[in-house]
Swiss-Prot record:
Transferase in keyword set: yes
InterPro entries tied to this protein: AFP_Neu5c_C, AFP_Neu5c_C_sf, Aldolase_TIM, Neu5Ac_N, Nonulosonic_Acid_Synth, SAF
Phylogenetic classification of the source organism: Eukaryota, Metazoa, Ecdysozoa, Arthropoda, Hexapoda
Keyword Transferase: yes
Protein name from the UniProt record: N-acetylneuraminate-9-phosphate synthase
Assigned keywords, A-Z: Transferase
GO terms, biological process: carbohydrate biosynthetic process; CMP-N-acetylneuraminate biosynthetic process; glycosylation; N-acetylneuraminate biosynthetic process; protein glycosylation
GO cellular component assignments: cytosol
Class of enzymatic activity (EC top level): transferase
Gene it is expressed from: Nans
A Pfam family assignment: NeuB
UniProt domain AFP-like: residue ranges: 314-372
Length: 372
């Protein structure tokens, strides 16, 4: 598979292109099949979905909250998400359809149960989305699978990315890639921070670096390739005007085709092109220049905070816990919580800590719930 050769470093002049269907299928298998065909025609190597086990990913309060939005598919957030989830049989249908069309099929594992589900499907690789990039229990479990990993790094600091790489190294995992990503939908060009691709390539020379973009248009994604990204992922839709929050920052078929054609025509090497030359080559404007502005290091950007606040994961109680109890691993879970609690990154640090309050099952563990 092309992705394996890119991750291993055997190929430096090829790009693996992923069409992120996500949940833009509107909960319809036939629409998903049509999207797979359109992505194949556009020249993509892979189509990717998003797999969630809702009770494993969200707390009950997060699922039960009222969801008022023009994009809602249900009265509660749980009903909305359930409408967009495919069953195992439906995933098998889509996987078989991809096999017929000779296009890779996979999904993001949004929780540990979904990771197990995708592993059992024997997908060619598993994606770990930005919302789980600091979910180290999930990352460790994924690293122990005999499957390549593609890990997005939106909403994370460079310190967290370094910890991801350390986690992979400690697990003996070599077949993985890191994706530069900004979790803002759509991403303003000035926030795209494309130079982080070069920063990541320099910091982690033995790791394949890719780009997961949420900007409008295709020129910034083309620039990412010229900077050294060898995996490109873009959200894909049949129609940007459709109901659903991801459609606006997705590419329609003709845009996706334009992107794959441009990338295929690039003559690539292991040496990234300087930003000034990229702007000239692509006939870029001020927006491309803004996307290519100098960046010192990776931080959580202000534009990412809405997504982080909505979908960032917290540490919650896996069962009812009493005041004075000292936490063990089995007492905690990592979920999207309403309200939010301590971040997933703190999970292992809480082992042995004493609770200052009673905490009910599925309730978030807050900073003031811990006696330091």
């Amino acid at each position: 598979m092309l992705l394996n050769d890119i991750i291993s470093g055997k190929l430096v002049d090829s790009v693996y292109i992923i069409a992120e269907i996500g949940q833009n299928h509107q909960g319809c298998v036939e629409t998903a099949k049509k999207m797979i065909w359109e992505a194949k025609k556009a020249g993509c190597h892979c189509v990717k979905f998003q797999k969630s086990d809702l009770p494993a990913k969200f707390t009950r309060s997060a699922l039960d909250r009222e969801y008022i939005s023009d994009h809602a598919w249900g009265k509660t957030y749980g009903e909305h998400k359930e409408y967009l989830e495919f069953s195992k049989d439906q995933y098998l249908q889509l996987q078989a359809h991809c096999k017929e069309l000779n296009v890779d099929f996979t999904a993001s594992a949004m929780d540990e149960r979904s990771l197990e589900f995708l592993s059992a499907l024997n997908v060619p690789f598993i994606k770990i989305g930005s919302g789980d990039a600091n979910n180290f229990p999930l990352l460790k479990k994924a690293a122990n699978l005999n499957l390549p990993l593609v890990i997005s790094t939106g909403m994370q600091t460079m310190q967290t990315v370094e910890r991801i790489v350390q986690t992979m190294r400690e697990s003996g995992k070599e077949d993985y890639a890191l994706m530069h990503c900004v979790s803002s939908y759509p991403t303003d060009p000035k926030d795209c921070s494309l130079q982080l691709i070069s920063v990541l390539r320099t910091r982690f020379p033995n790791v394949a670096i890719g780009y997961s973009g949420h900007e409008l248009g295709v020129i910034i994604s083309q620039a990412a390739v010229l900077l050294g990204a060898r995996i490109v992922e873009r959200h894909f839709t049949l129609d940007k005007s459709q109901k659903g929050s991801d459609h606006r920052c997705s590419l329609e078929p003709q845009e996706l085709k334009a992107l794959t054609t441009a990338i295929t025509n690039f003559k690539l090497s292991s040496v990234p092109m300087p930003p000034q030359e990229i702007v000239k080559k692509l006939n870029g404007d001020e927006e491309l220049e803004a996307a290519l502005q100098h960046v010192e290091s990776k931080t959580i950007l202000p534009c990412e905070l809405p997504c982080r606040n909505k979908l960032g994961k917290s540490i919650v109680a896996a069962r009812n816990l009493n005041k004075g109890y000292r936490l063990q691993l089995a007492d905690m879970a990592i979920k999207v919580s309403e309200p939010s609690g301590l971040t997933a990154e703190d999970f292992l640090d809480l082992v042995g800590k004493e609770l200052a309050d009673n905490i009910g099952e599925d309730e978030p563990i807050l900073g003031n719930s811990i006696i330091n």
